[in-house]
Swiss-Prot record:
It comes from Saccharomyces cerevisiae (strain YJM789). It comes from the Eukaryota. This is GTP-binding protein YPT11. Pfam families: Ras. It is a lipid-anchor. It is found in: Endoplasmic reticulum membrane; Bud tip; Bud neck. InterPro entries: P-loop_NTPase, Rab, Small_GTP-bd, Small_GTPase. Belongs to the small GTPase superfamily. Rab family. The keyword Membrane applies. The keyword Nucleotidyltransferase does not apply. The gene is YPT11. Involved in the positive control of both endoplasmic reticulum (ER) and mitochondrion inheritance during cell divison. Required for the MYO2-dependent retention of newly inherited mitochondria at the bud tip in developing daughter cells. A lipid is attached at C415, C416 (S-geranylgeranyl cysteine).
């Protein structure tokens, strides 16, 4: 009885077949989106309504938008280049003249990079504070390092050695605090100075310095490139050929307190410019004469008569025209800026710039005057638009007893009424 086999009653049932999971049809051809109806497309993305014992509202189907990889989906421009960014046109200004006439200061003044006396003192004070912070930080690190080294080696030293180490640290701290603590100017000497006065502290140019400035003229941008050249002859031999290439304006700079620099413009600089200009670049170049340091008018050595005489002599001797004559001071920012703007406007009006916009043609003031003259020559007589007013003859209802009354209807004259 103990070995009797026991059986259990198991009901054999068919295995449950899982319901198919909903799968969204993958449409590879984008043209099928237009062919499929909205109802069928919405129902294809809906799960089985009886699956899981839940019923979903068919109106909540999620529609996938077609791919936006088609051309023109995002309004992109084609390869025609219509959406390319137009670069601003270039205007090259070349400043030449003797050394120490103020070419660098003029460029910095136009770019507003010269500091006033208050800004200069503030920058010096800030620089001194930064240096002092670095020195204090270095001193703290030195003291900490000494203490750590002493702590590591305290068993190797005696009390006399500790006293010696502390004396060395104090001596080093005193030297560091005293070092690099210069007096920032004499406050008594600068109490009466104007804090808004521009301080001109420039160094002699070695080679070439280039500054750029972007200007907007009638909603058109121009990239003004200012070339600052070295006045000393030893720095010019290697760079002369590349100076005058594609130059639009040559600014002859001189010092009104130095007659020698004024004569050099006639005897040296204008000759050098004409020798190195190519015939093509010379057609688009204009010459200007600028005198600097008019704030030192009491020390003037170059008079206005000398300037006018030199301009006439340049036109007769070299056959060039001086397009403008100016006098500026780098300490007066508005004067330098107005002078440079007048030079730039003159260049733009005469088409002396490198046009980077192919859609805009260069039109000079001479061309405009030529078209106006041609228009006036074609018209022999002026247009006289006169309008004559015609008066309608109204019949007079009054009767003049001194004249016979004409009967127009019967073509007869009646003496009386």
């Amino acid at each position: 009885m103990s070995q009797r086999k026991r059986y259990s009653l198991n009901v054999v049932t068919s295995p449950s077949i899982p319901s198919p999971t909903p799968s969204a049809p993958i449409r590879t051809n984008e043209s099928n989106w237009e062919a499929a109806s909205p109802a069928s497309a919405a129902s294809s993305f809906l799960p089985n309504v009886h699956h899981g014992g839940t019923v979903l509202n068919p109106g909540l189907g999620i529609m996938r938008s077609p791919s936006l990889n088609k051309s023109g989906a995002f309004g992109r421009s084609g390869s025609s280049g219509s959406s390319t960014v137009i670069e601003p046109s270039n205007i090259k200004l070349l400043l030449i003249g003797d050394a120490n006439v103020g070419k660098t200061a003029m460029i910095l003044s136009y770019c507003r990079e010269l500091l006033t006396r208050a800004e200069m003192s503030r920058s010096v004070r800030l620089r001194h504070q930064q240096q002092q912070q670095h020195k204090d930080l270095g001193l703290k690190k030195t003291v900490v390092n000494h203490r750590l080294s002493m702590k590591e080696k305290r068993k190797r030293y005696s009390s006399n050695d500790f006293e010696k180490e502390f004396k060395d640290i104090n001596h080093f701290a005193d030297e560091t605090s005293d070092f690099g603590n210069p007096n920032i100017g004499d406050d008594n000497n600068h109490e009466m100075a104007d804090p808004n006065e521009i301080v001109i502290e420039t160094r002699s140019t070695i080679g070439i310095d280039i500054k750029t400035n972007l200007v907007n003229i009638d909603n058109r941008f121009f990239n003004v490139i200012l070339w600052d050249t070295a006045g000393q002859e030893r720095y010019q031999n290697a760079i002369i050929p590349s100076l005058y290439k594609k130059t639009n304006a040559v600014i002859l700079t001189y010092d009104i307190t130095n007659a020698k620099s004024f004569q050099s413009c006639m005897e040296r600089w204008i000759v050098q410019a004409l020798e190195n200009f190519s015939s093509q670049d010379l057609l688009k170049a204009r010459f200007f004469l600028v005198g600097n340091k008019i704030d030192l008018y009491k020390e003037r050595q170059v008079t206005h008569y000398d300037v006018v005489q030199m301009v006439q002599e340049m036109q007769l001797k070299h056959g060039i025209k001086i397009s403008g004559n100016f006098e500026v001071s780098c300490k007066w920012v508005n004067v330098v800026e107005r002078t440079m703007n007048m030079i730039i406007l003159d260049l733009v009006e005469n088409g002396c710039f490198e046009n980077n916009d192919p859609c805009v043609s260069i039109t000079t003031s001479d061309d405009v005057q030529g078209h106006e003259q041609e228009f006036h020559d074609t018209v022999e007589e002026p247009f006289n638009f006169t309008r004559q007013r015609q008066h309608q003859l109204e019949k007079n209802n009054t009767v003049d007893i001194t004249k016979p009354n004409d009967d127009i209807a019967n073509n007869q004259s009646i003496c009386c009424v």
